[in-house]
Design a protein with these regions (language model features):
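N-terminal cationic and glycine-rich segments that engage phosphates or anionic surfaces
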Residues: 1-58
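A short linear-motif detector with a strong N-terminal bias
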Residues: 11-12, 25-26, 66-69, 79-83, ...
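General N-terminal targeting signals
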Residues: 22, 48, 57-58, 63, ...
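Conserved, well-folded catalytic cores of nucleic-acid-processing
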Residues: 23, 34, 63-70, 127
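Short, charged/polar low-complexity linear motifs in solvent-exposed/disordered segments
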Residues: 30, 65-66, 117-118
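Internal alpha/beta loop-helix hairpins
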Residues: 44-76, 80
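Non-DNA-binding regulatory cores of transcription-related proteins
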Residues: 74-130
Length: 130
């Protein structure tokens, strides 16, 4: 099943993937340079670069696990009932306050493109849909 994603977020994702690829290449250079300094056991620069590379690879893999995508235009978002792309206001009776959430997908959550994102796959997201 395709992961729903807003067109703007898809563009941001493509940009982020390019940025991560660039960082990965730069980190590979850092690793080679640090390795050329000798003993890797006590080479902090080498270990820091390897850790950075691991982070970049994990982030890339996390973003890729959500493909394929179903790109959604803002004009396609339904507003007559709660669903993907909606901004939802929920009143907390205990705290006596209203919080606003955006019901979006995991990529919007991962890229932190919106404040207060709830993914439509999450239990909370599923509870408020419809």
């Amino acid at each position: 099943m395709a992961t729903m994603i807003l067109r703007d977020t898809h563009r941001a994702l493509e940009q982020k993937m390019k940025e991560l690829e660039k960082q990965k290449k730069e980190t590979s250079i850092k690793i080679r340079e640090a390795a050329s300094h000798g003993d890797l056991k006590e080479n902090g620069e080498y270990h820091a670069a390897r850790e950075e590379q691991s982070f970049i690879v994990r982030k890339t893999q996390t973003l890729q696990t959500h493909s394929p995508f179903q790109i959604v235009e803002y004009s396609e978002i339904e507003t007559d009932e709660v669903g993907f792309g909606n901004k939802v206001s929920i009143y907390d009776e205990v705290k006596e306050e209203t919080k606003e959430y955006y019901l979006l997908g995991p990529i919007e959550f991962e890229l932190d493109t919106f404040p207060m994102v709830v993914t439509y796959h999450s239990p909370f997201g599923q509870a408020i849909i419809g």
